Amino acid sequence: MSGEDEQQEQTIAEDLVVTKYKMGGDIANRVLRSLVEASSSGVSVLSLCEKGDAMIMEETGKIFKKEKEMKKGIAFPTSISVNNCVCHFSPLKSDQDYILKEGDLVKIDLGVHVDGFIANVAHTFVIGVAQGTQVTGRKADVIKAAHLCAEAALRLVKPGNQNTQVTEAWNKVAHSFNCTPIEGMLSHQLKQHVIDGEKTIIQNPTDQQKKDHEKAEFEVHEVYAVDVLVSSGEGKAKDAGQRTTIYKRDPSKQYGLKMKTSRAFFSEVERRFDAMPFTLRAFEDEKKARMGVVECAKHELLQPFNVLYEKEGEFVAQFKFTVLLMPNGPMRITSGPFEPDLYKSEMEVQDAELKALLQSSASRKTQKKKKKKASKTVENATSGETLEENGAGD
């Protein structure tokens, strides 16, 4: 990113920026729905990850065609983490694949950007739920808990509120279902070309993290990727030795790479992905990419997104949405096709204050402002109602 870009930060105070976010959100929602529909027993996770990434590239290739210099595409590679796998499972062709089976709890996580404006989304569902039946037991508990955490956050991430209010609500919601938010996971503010902005919301912090984590107030015209990860177990995510395949460049780090393979790999990263997360799958020669990444990661030019696991036998559910803090209320631009009636838990939120919050409306005040001409592709993401009402649930 050039110095000029840094001086003139573009925000959602500009209509065109809002349109770019919505277009990215619309693509993210459509790709997600397509992957959910394609997920069934016997389907390979690798094939779904490849399909998701290919669709994002294809769909972003259809917009702003005249703007030859504009970067657009994947803001987070398609990851599909099953059951006790917490996040970032996105295998290479040379890795062991995972084949989906009946009853698997599946989390799909992906991101799209248009001109560096990022729309992230994640969704959880269970494979092969027969019509007329419901998911029960711990899978239902953890999915309900995570979904209600996301719904609480949609109502709490608004100007004037603090990030700590969201953290507290998440703990209360999860505990009502005898579940635990994954310890130390962060939701980030988003800025142009930046997926990990400085303001964050932490989940289930340790005592040390509570001391270290910056308190922050949400402000109008900010954007957040709100990421909820809840476990049926203790909420501790560990690296189990699975190969990391997703990385992002850290623009603040510099180092003179010694190996020719590393240098060639890193210059391709800079050219193609800038500071967006990418997968080693995106390289033509996967073997060279696997070699090139080692020196880059060792010297912290690249940050890894490690594949994390909860204990065997536990379940982890994830819901992530991107929200624009508009002057007339929060606008959620991404969301999955959640069907609440499929999940039956014996537990529910007991806390009266939280119950009232969850029952309150999350739709925005309508403005009598003349609509700017937005692209056809974003019409169904522009109403600003919660997306369940305008197509995210169909």
Curated annotation (Swiss-Prot):
Single biological process term from Gene Ontology: regulation of translation
Induction info: By mitogens.
Reported modifications of this chain: Phosphorylated on serine and threonine residues. Phosphorylation is enhanced by HRG treatment. Basal phosphorylation is PKC-dependent and HRG-induced phosphorylation is predominantly PKC-independent. Phosphorylation at Ser-361 by PKC/PRKCD regulates its nucleolar localization. Isoform 2 is polyubiquitinated, leading to proteasomal degradation and phosphorylation by PKC/PRKCD enhances polyubiquitination.
Keywords of this entry: Acetylation, Cytoplasm, Isopeptide bond, Nucleus, Phosphoprotein, Repressor, Ribonucleoprotein, RNA-binding, rRNA processing, Transcription, Transcription regulation, Translation regulation, Ubl conjugation
Gene for this chain: Pa2g4
A Pfam family recorded for this sequence: Peptidase_M24
Subunit structure: Isoform 2 interacts with the cytoplasmic domain of non-phosphorylated ERBB3; the interaction requires PKC activity. Interacts with AR. Treatment with HRG leads to dissociation from ERBB3 and increases association with AR. Interacts with nucleolin/NCL. Component of a ribonucleoprotein complex containing at least PA2G4, NCL, TOP1, PABPC2, RPLP0, acetylated histone H1 (HIST1H1A or H1F1), histone H1 2/4, RPL4, RPL8, RPL15, RPL18, RPL18A, RPL21, RPL11, RPL12, RPL28, RPL27, RPLP2 and RPL24. Interacts with HDAC2. Interacts with RB1; the interaction is enhanced upon PA2G4 dephosphorylation.
Organism: Mus musculus (Mouse)
Keyword Membrane assigned: no
Region (Interaction with RNA): 361-375
Function statement: May play a role in a ERBB3-regulated signal transduction pathway. Seems be involved in growth regulation. Acts a corepressor of the androgen receptor (AR) and is regulated by the ERBB3 ligand neuregulin-1/heregulin (HRG). Inhibits transcription of some E2F1-regulated promoters, probably by recruiting histone acetylase (HAT) activity. Binds RNA. Associates with 28S, 18S and 5.8S mature rRNAs, several rRNA precursors and probably U3 small nucleolar RNA. May be involved in regulation of intermediate and late steps of rRNA processing. May be involved in ribosome assembly.
Protein name per the record: Proliferation-associated protein 2G4
Entry GO MF terms: nucleic acid binding; RNA binding; transcription corepressor activity; ubiquitin protein ligase binding
Residues bearing the modification Phosphothreonine: T366, T386
UniProt cross-link Glycyl lysine isopeptide (Lys-Gly) (interchain with G-Cter in SUMO2), position: K298
One CC-aspect GO term: ribonucleoprotein complex
